[in-house]
Amino acid sequence: MSAPILFPLSAPESSFTIAGRLFHHAWPVLVAQLLSMSMLIADTVITGRYGTLDLAAVAVGSGVYISIVMLLVGVLQAVAPTVAHHFGARRVDAIGPALQQGFWLALMLALPGIALLAFPGFLLELSSVPADVAGKTRDYLLATAFGLPAVLLYRTFYAFNNALGRPRALMMISFIVTSTHIPLAWALVHGAFGLPPLGAIGCGISTAIVNWIAFACGAGYLAHNRDYRPYRLFANWQPPRRRDLLALLKLGIPMGLSTFIEVSSFTLIALFAARLGAEAVAGHRVVANLAALIYMLPLAISIAILVLVGQAAGAREPARARATVRVGMGLTVGLVALIGVLLWVGREPVVALFSADPAVRAVALGLVFYICIYQIFDAVQTVAAHALRGYKVTFMPMLLHALCFWGIALAGGYWLAFHAPGREQSPTVAGFWEASVVATILASVLFGWLLRVVMRRPQNVQT
């Protein structure tokens, strides 16, 4: 029995057709990402109304939790290009085993992740978290640890479903999870519906519960959807295979580290910015939130590019892969540039939505220009990095991410903010954004160069 082919794999495609396929895949991913962001915002609002210590605990704890999860989830993203290549090559019998090995890897990665969440003492000491906040943070992280296996298993399903070009299920599951988490977290934190008020730990418990709900929905979808039957996903279950696991790790560890490098660089920038005072760090946070929100669009399109490039590479159709990169790059940069122009024109009312404090708004308005430029070049490097993942090239991109985000954005930003000529006595958070712009410009050049090299390889230029 042949697998259902979701996209044409051999017919010539126009740029409009490719753009349509990218939009078809990207918009459900974008909605799913925005729903996930709304859960983090909800946790902040819910605990903020409960108490300052609990809000601080969730702020610190969620930063630790997200860093650990993104590192491990990044490794599991290796399932996406692996399955996309199998799908493009119509290796139906290899698709089910690839998912099974991904699930095994998720369970293995859960062990060190649980240990870090259950015993975060050294991480909190490094951050110099006050004792009263640290206690609540430990409780929050311990609660989230119970849901870590579920979130890793679900993210394996997430990568698998993306690779097959079926992102709408991810959007629906994200809607279910978000609509469950918000009232559940409120009830657990504040003690509604007869439950005792738990404070910060309530958000952690709710996060763990909805992670298991997400995985249950994903597993149920795989088990009962007819389109997946040819892949025999749960039949002939295979034990962990050393060769397959090593292949996933070889591909996934650089992906996980790349994600961790980006996340940690912005986390550390926020910590360094805190030295500049409440107004500076609050203004930085406003602009960082805007940047994160805008980033969801190029990230969603880039995920679609990864999948379509991976499918084309697996099908040995390099012309289609190159066309996907070309159209995807133009589409993404064009949209982000438009958003940047609109943000610049409407910067004052947009910033006013985030803060009523004139001092905070003044800092944020002084930084808006930087993110308008930053987002354009960040979109270029994001598309290029994901296209390279579609070609199963991940190690060199990891090194480039380290150079640009740790070496320039973080280290260079620290120097520009605190030690650049004229700023020793009047440090400014703008230094970090100046360095970030330089870092993304360099990243866009280096990633663009590497992508061109990869696309010109003999196996990627045949027609």
From Swiss-Prot:
The chain crosses the membrane at residues 59-81, 102-124, 139-161, 173-195, 200-222, 251-273, 288-310, 323-345, 360-377, 397-419, 429-451. The keyword rRNA-binding does not apply. It holds the Pfam family MatE. It is found in: Cell inner membrane. GO terms for cellular component: plasma membrane. GO terms for biological process: monoatomic ion transport. InterPro entries: MATE_fam (IPR002528), MATE_MdtK (IPR050222), MdtK-like (IPR048279). Its main location: membrane. GO terms for molecular function: antiporter activity; xenobiotic transmembrane transporter activity. Keywords: Antiport, Cell inner membrane, Cell membrane, Ion transport, Membrane, Transmembrane, Transmembrane helix, Transport. It is a multi-pass membrane protein. Multidrug efflux pump. Belongs to the multi antimicrobial extrusion (MATE) (TC 2.A.66.1) family. PANTHER family: FMN_FAD EXPORTER YEEO-RELATED (PTHR43298:SF2), MULTIDRUG RESISTANCE PROTEIN NORM-RELATED (PTHR43298). This is Probable multidrug resistance protein NorM.
